[in-house]
Amino acid sequence: MRETGIHNTAASIATSGLKEISAVFYNLGAARLYEETVRRGEAELSAQGALVARTGQHTGRSPKDKFVVRDADTEDHVWWDNNKPMSREAFELLYADFIDHAKGKELFVQDLIGGADADNKINARVITEYAWHSLFIRNLLIRPEQEALASYVPEMTIIDLPTFKADPERYGVRTETVIAVDLTRKIVLIGGTSYAGEMKKSVFTALNYILPAKGVMPMHCSANEGPNGDTAVFFGLSGTGKTTLSADPTRTLIGDDEHGWGEHGIFNFEGGCYAKTIRLSAEAEPEIYATTQRFGTVLENVVLDENRQPDFDDGSLTENTRCAYPLDFIPNASKSGKGGQPKNIIMLTADAFGVMPPIAKLTPAQAMYHFLSGYTAKVAGTEKGVTEPEATFSTCFGAPFMPRHPSEYGNLLRKLIAEHKVDCWLVNTGWTGGAYGVGKRMPIKATRALLAAALDGSLNDAEFRIDPNFGFAVPVDVPGVDTSILDPRSTWADKAAYDAQAKKLVDMFVTNFEKFESHVDHEVKDAAPAIRIAAE
């Protein structure tokens, strides 16, 4: 076995059972990985020097093909309603077949870290079949100092073999694609998909399982820090403005997707960003755009023209086009990946029903209720001629990555909010003046002004009213913001239509929350919107 690159010789990939490998490349940097990628015909270069790869049939994650090993250790700690079980026997068989499939191949190894907090990190070794996957994960996770590599010992291992095709009958899986997570032994096997995001989310899944047992809250969120050291956390599902609103030139970006909250404050799990690029422009998002114009960035499923110029408006391969780059490609990014205890938590929603106010203040119990609900609304595709919005509830703002029961994360969040006296806000970046198709999108200028007032503390001094449907506190007047949009009902021409729409959304919240009723106390139950409606 030919081995190249700095690594701990006492912890080679042979310790994972990988033998009879043609060649192993450890911890190669970007330039070497570019050479290997092009030599192997895996990707091409853009005119500006980014590496451009296509992922084939899988242009997004495959949540239905993800399995968690069910054993004595995980039996009582994993939320099996949301995680598909795999038997220990099936996993061992799959693992043996992965080892067999890797024989004779060239493999790429990156020894990386998940978690910027030394007390709460995990050494994650990622072994990949493709050179471009090695660069992708090197960009996304935290890279140890060069001198630390010779003594690096992995605590978690991901083996990523896109050319492996799973036999559904043999392993009890659904398709040829498989993501098998062994939380007890900290091994992840990824096969039958070239979508690189699966590797990143596997580390997130592991930390989401490990950290709550240590009293540390894992979060699917972005985070930034103000000039006075005040940290803000932004929860939100895809399309709610999480990346856009946390990328503020006046504040330091801690990270854009995955963080932990522990005794020392907020810390990033990652060392890079994985940003959507569909319809990306230099005018709207200059910092993200700039990363796509340089060497070292990986562009995923972005279409190039004959001159190798990226066309970010072309969604012919997928709408889920992405770029992966190290955090230090962003000028105002944190070098430490850490921030203090948060002063504000923002829960973002894009309410396409046009019912919710642009901002509301939440009590700790309401924050837990809305965190467990994880609400946003998607707008149906116009090609189907459907104008009715579709409510989406993804608990903890990231259900696919949460191995434990949501109430564990919810209780931990509520405890930390109370302990550190954090102000919590619900911010609606969706529709005002009517539902989607009638109303208009909430003006981004208004959202930014409300957010700025929340973050600098001035919004706490405003006069508030209690929303009759949701029971949270809504400011009556905020300097620089049109007062009319603060009361969503007043923006609707047809008040009866608003009331009917509000009741419809409230009912959706209530129905969705039924599965959590037995896991929460009376305070959180009382934070439900239906209580207010019933009382009137």
Swiss-Prot record:
GO BP: gluconeogenesis
Binding positions (Mn(2+)): 201, 220, 257
Family to which this protein belongs: Belongs to the phosphoenolpyruvate carboxykinase (ATP) family.
Keywords tagged on the record: ATP-binding, Cytoplasm, Decarboxylase, Gluconeogenesis, Lyase, Manganese, Metal-binding, Nucleotide-binding
Family matches, as InterPro entries: PEP_carboxykinase_ATP (IPR001272), PEP_carboxykinase_C (IPR013035), PEP_carboxykinase_N (IPR008210), PEPCK_ATP_CS (IPR015994)
Keyword Manganese: yes
One GO MF term attached to the UniProt entry: metal ion binding
Pathway recorded for this protein: Carbohydrate biosynthesis; gluconeogenesis
Name of protein: Phosphoenolpyruvate carboxykinase (ATP)
Residues binding ATP: 201, 220, 236-244, 285, 322, 447
Cofactor(s) required, per the database record: Mn(2+)
Catalyzed reaction equations: oxaloacetate + ATP = phosphoenolpyruvate + ADP + CO2
Cellular compartments annotated: Cytoplasm
Its job: Involved in the gluconeogenesis. Catalyzes the conversion of oxaloacetate (OAA) to phosphoenolpyruvate (PEP) through direct phosphoryl transfer between the nucleoside triphosphate and OAA.
Keyword Nucleotide-binding: yes
GO CC aspect terms: cytosol
Enzyme Commission designation: 4.1.1.49
Binding site for substrate: 61, 195, 201, 322
SUPFAM superfamilies for this protein: PEP carboxykinase N-terminal domain (SSF68923), PEP carboxykinase-like (SSF53795)
UniProt xrefs under Pfam families: PEPCK_ATP (PF01293)
Enzyme class: lyase
Cofactor notes: Binds 1 Mn(2+) ion per subunit.
Origin: domain of life: Bacteria
